[in-house]
Amino acid sequence: EMCIRDRGKGVLICENEQQAADGVKEIMLDKKFGASGNHVVVEEFLTGPEVSVLSFTDGKVVKPMVSSMDHKRANDHDTGLNTGGMGTIAPNPYYTPEVAAECMEKIFLPTIHAMNAEGCPFKGCLYFGLMLTPDGPKVIEYNCRFGDPETQVVLPLLESDLLHIMQSCTDGTLAQQEVKFSDGAAACVILASGGYPVAYEKGKPISGLVDGQLPDEENVTVYHSGTAITEDGQLVTNGGRVLGVTATGPRLTNALSHAYEAAEKISFEKLHKRSDIGLRALKALAEKQ
């Protein structure tokens, strides 16, 4: 088995050579994902829970943020095409202290040291997309930026001052800077246009929001992605992933129920969302008890 990836818009899982050939044709010739398919990468197929770890670094030390779990497939039960992400939860229950220590020793610090050795020191936010395989943690992807929609559940849990952390990354004092996260949880549910990630319509009026947010909702933030405002002031859809509804709570169950309750108050024509964000994480938590 193998994976065929374009420039971030989609991934095809291929079980044999014929599926791989068909996949390359769909991406590169049929332009299934548009211009993102001008180049593809063929990768080994790995299995295991996925973990997203955003981290701060000043080029010398790495301070990971709270872990998160993305939900890439478009539909429930992890079916359908891969997307940019249909929802996230934090923290990720599969990312135990033991796994975190192994990642720091074998992945995070070696990455920073290697970049320094190549004369390309990095300062800022470094995103590690990991898979916890039977052979240990493996790197699926790096990003030199915050992740979307991971950031929507990570930063709401940050208790330290973000500006001070960013400043310490630039001036090389991150080792002395506190990076503290709350003990709570966060969940984000993406509201997408029907047909995403392939063909979808734009310009659908969005209802339920006041000044872009849900009124009278505590611990809920609506993040805008594919939205626009018409000349007459109407908020409309303008992309595949339209809105992200994030809720925080003392436990994951609280955050998830609140996020879904809030999402129900928003509507637009052909709205699509997954109904099972976080269920895998809840099962993992239940197994630990």
Label every PLM stretch briefly:
Residues 2-4:
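Short, small-residue-biased leader/transition segments that mark boundaries at the very start
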Residues 10-151:
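Internal nucleotide-binding/catalytic subdomain
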Residues 56, 190-192, 246-248:
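Short hydrophobic/aromatic beta-strand micro-patches
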Residues 102-126, 143-217, 230:
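Active-site "cap" helix and flanking loop/linker of ATP-utilizing ligase/carboxylase catalytic domains
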Residues 227-232, 236-289:
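Generic C-terminus detector
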